[in-house]
Amino acid sequence: RNLKPIASYLLAGSIILLMITKGYYLINGIESPARWLYLGLFSFQTSDIARLSLIIFLAYYLDEIKARIKNLYDGFLPPVTAIGILMAFIVIQPDFSTAFMVGLIGILLLFISGARIFHILTSFFAGLLISFPVIYFSPYRWARIRSFFNPDIKSDGYQAYQAELSMSNGGWFGSGLGNSTEKNHLLPTPHTDFIFSIIGEELGFLLGTLPLLLVFLFIFFRGIKIAKRCTDPFGIFLAMGICINIVLYAFVNAAVATGLFPVTGLPMPLISYGGSGMFINMVMIGILLNISQAKRSINNSKTWSSLSFG
């Protein structure tokens, strides 16, 4: 409830942070992707903050307008515009994968809220049309798409090939903790983008990757159950947005590691190394737990324990 009054300010603040991040890199002539904002000894990825802010804003907005979401101009168009603006500022960092995920999460929330299918499909295909030149005229993005359909293991397809090789090395039961060969300068970014491959190599399918995916499915279905029990529409949309976000990121990361998706650079939630991403995901889990205990604490305030959730 404390998030509702500041939802719009959080979204506006996130857009400002994205602008500051890009401006900082341009002013200082830094050629690397403008994804991190540095404050002394600390740094954080501003798109992570934007992702959470958008979920909170959409939950607030959908709660406020309710059935008007079926109207185009005073219902559906404002949140789609907010999603588009946020995606645009993330794309120019450049971080197309995160922008795509932000858009997908937003569209799914609009679908859950009861928006017209025609409006949703129109927005989705419009996004695809805009995305094509963004991908095609970016050499490294187009190389990732091209290598997915025609992999060159010595060039653009090297990462994907090594990730699949790592998974195959693990087999059913893995090579043992710490025994991965791929993480020793063979597979790029094994601690972030391809952590799922290393888990598969060291712990195997039965002890590593399958249990991990089941944990994320548990979080997803638990989040849906929390949303169904919640009596506040804001809490319902917030819980749904959070569990959709977590499970989408998890399964896209796993799909990249197994060769089902092109390389995206998206981390595995709660697993991949990274301060700001880990912090934001923990905040999301905390909000989900808060929504879960709210109804119980009201109905049974004398016996409620902070250790009991759901």
Which residues does each predicted region cover?
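Membrane-helix boundary/helix-loop-helix interface segments in multi-pass membrane proteins
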Residues: R1-Q93, A254-P269, Y273, G277-M278, ...
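Hydrophobic alpha-helical segments of polytopic membrane proteins
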Residues: S8-I15, Y73-V91, F96-Y136
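Residue-level signal for the membrane-embedded core of alpha-helical transmembrane segments
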Residues: L10, A50-F57, P211-F218, L238, ...
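Hydrophobic, glycine- and aromatic-enriched re-entrant/interface helices and adjoining loop segments
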Residues: I30-W36, H119-P211, C230-G235
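Alpha-helical transmembrane segments of polytopic integral membrane proteins
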Residues: I55, A59-L62, P139-W142, L217-F220, ...
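Interfacial segments of multi-pass membrane proteins
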Residues: L62, G103-H119, T181-L207, L266-F279
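Membrane-proximal intracellular helices of multi-pass ion channels
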Residues: P139, L213, F220-G235, N300-F309
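Loop-to-helix entry and N-terminal half of a specific, functionally important transmembrane alpha helix
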Residues: I226-G265, I271
